[in-house]
Amino acid sequence: MKSLSGYVESITFRNEENGYTVLTLSYGKKEMKCTGNFGYISEGEYLEIEGEEVFHDIYGEQIKVTSYKVIPATDELSLKKYLGSGAIKGLGAVLANRIVDKFGEDTLRIVEEEPERLAEIRGITIRKAMDICEQVEEKKDMRDVMIFLQGYGISPTLSNKIYTMYGQKVYDIIKTNPYKLADDLSGIGFKTADEIARRAGVEVNASIRIKSGMCYALSDASLSGHTYLPKEKLVEKTINLLGLRDQYLNADGTYNMDLLDNCFTELVLEKKLILKNIEEKDAVFLSTYYYTELNIARMLLELNISTPEDDYIMGVKLDTIEKLSGVELDDLQRKAVIETQNNGITIITGGPGTGKTTTINAIIQMFEADGLEVSLAAPTGRAAKRMNEATGHEAKTIHRLLEISGGASEETGRDEIDAKFGRNEQNPLETDVIIVDEMSMVDTFLVHALLKAITIGTRVVFVGDINQLASVGPGNVLRDIIESEQFSVVRLTKVFRQAGESGIVTNAHKINKGEQVALDNSMGDFLYIERENAQMALNATIGLMMSKLPQYVEAKPMDIQVLTPMRGGILGVNSLNEQLQKYINPQDENKREREIAGVIFREGDKVMQIKNNYQLEWEQRSEGGRIYDSGTGIFNGDMGIITTINNTTNTMEVVFDDDRYVIYDSKQAEELELAYAITIHKSQGSEYPAVIMPLVSGVSMLMTRNLLYTGVTRAKKCVCIVGRKETFSAMIANEDQHRRYSGLKWQLVNYYNEEQ
């Protein structure tokens, strides 16, 4: 181990997330590169460090710092370096030298105790003197907090958030209730707060720990799509989370509920939790989710105004539309169009080939014939693009329709709840009719934001396939609306002749019904290649991608999509992307590349955004480079191509499917992943010329019927199953669907009954 004392001459690099810093320490007439987690320090500060001497191939001798201490500046040289480092706004080297030359080693005492005396220096007013004093005190307080929090394993970025929100109160919060950090701030989850609490000496069965654990258990359940949990499941999840099973489990297998019930009752009285009876069981909601679903129910029922039209007039209008469009609607399609005229809310659901698009076009024509304005929307950019191509009308993502204007608040960082929309109750959408496609993908918070921007009297049409996978976010919106039986629902069931000749459509309906599919390659758009193990399936997938399918479906390899149920393993997303990249976009001296979080990204790579980012700025450009639109927000599932990588500025540019260009910095780029292969969940709302699905084996909870159905229906011209027939058949037979505990259906029925 080596010890050194010196000034921070310069900071070369700092990772704001984890505090890893590369700096140059000046001691005597020498300098030394130092690396380590330094937290909040500035150039010019005096450090005592201890660490291990290492030798870097490029940068030479360094010290890998294991511990350090900030020593307050006392001698004139260190005072000049600290005050003149630029860390204090408005104070440069010249003024710093004047201050220290006048006050010498008494400078910091003067700044802290008699700041008005700084005005004795030429160039410093009383106001500026007080500002310098405040900054020095603020930096001292902040540094003390950073060092204090670092002792609890908290990163500099989170420490900065904590200090910004609480200031000097943070000391009391850590000592009395560190779980408040998890309640108030994103990025400090329950597990982080629990570790802080452990270090602070909080007992494992303390009521503050149990209460926070219950809230976290419900929040964590929302990541699996739940908006509530039955009380017994919440108790079990909380006890397992807190590691209290042995302490609370009785001999008969029940739990000792005394302390748990006390904590639960307190949370209900504090209105953090809401307790209701659903399906004759105690259902527990986080208050946010309960009131969000309650408001959704209220708004839907208020919008559902019945305005019956004359049947004869409606029939004449439909006949005219059929003549003008040259399309004959079947009885269910006609009914769907009529229902949208008669009701404020209409739901149209159906599988592939049942004429949903034809029906949407007829609905648009009917309303426009009456001089009404129709707006089209979908949850993803790809789905909106498909809607636009199918109707010839502009379709926007729901986020863009609502004019997303930024995301999470800086204090909390909670994206979905704090997302800011330009369209809302005060500034509603100016339209007569709204048609939303791919409604099965829309989660609780997004439909809540949409409904808030719709005025009573506007017609709303929800279109979707109820058998697709549920939304990634919490809730079961489309299914709950349908099953509430409070609205007009039209189920399109007829598969039209042209669609019926498609192997994709025919087999998708068979899969949905649980009927086995003959993998005999008798239909040219539904192919099967038998491979017994993962490596063989991988090789076949690469061969299909590079040589067979592009010519067969007249598409580039880049446009063909590999879909898989899983992320891990040879046939998981991570491995598939690594292998496919080598063939589709191989290393080239003319292509710049960059490693981010262990993944190589290269110019020309196909990538996907994997989380909503409401702050990312984008611009749309014409072929000549003229910017014709701009905005903020790139969303989970958006796909694009890396156009340029700039290793000087550590940025890369991605152009997304709808011609939005985005520049990512290093941190933002961690929200991207290669997208030659994606999970079936991520493919929702998209359509590809061809889909390859490698299916050799997998855990039963992933290998389900509706997952297979969703994957198959993503293909437009051809789907190719690669793997084992037994696995394919088992997926069809596995109708186990992950049960989502959502309260919207109950809210709709309950609210309706109360209003009657």
Model regions and ranges:
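Accessory, non-ATPase domains that flank or precede helicase/AAA+ motor cores in DNA-metabolism machines
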Residues: M1-I313, Q756
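Loop/turn positions that initiate beta-strands
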Residues: G44-Y46, G604, G637
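ASCE P-loop NTPase motor cores of helicases and related translocases
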Residues: I274-V433, S488-R497, I504-Y528
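Loop/turn-to-beta-strand initiation segments
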Residues: E373, E430-V433, G457-V461, C718
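Walker B catalytic acidic pair
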Residues: E438, G464
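Short, conserved "post-DEAD/DEAH" coupling segment immediately C-terminal to helicase motif II
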Residues: T444-T458, L478-I481
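Conserved helicase motor core of P-loop NTPases
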Residues: I466-T632, Y751
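C-terminal accessory regions
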Residues: S630-G631, N636-Q756
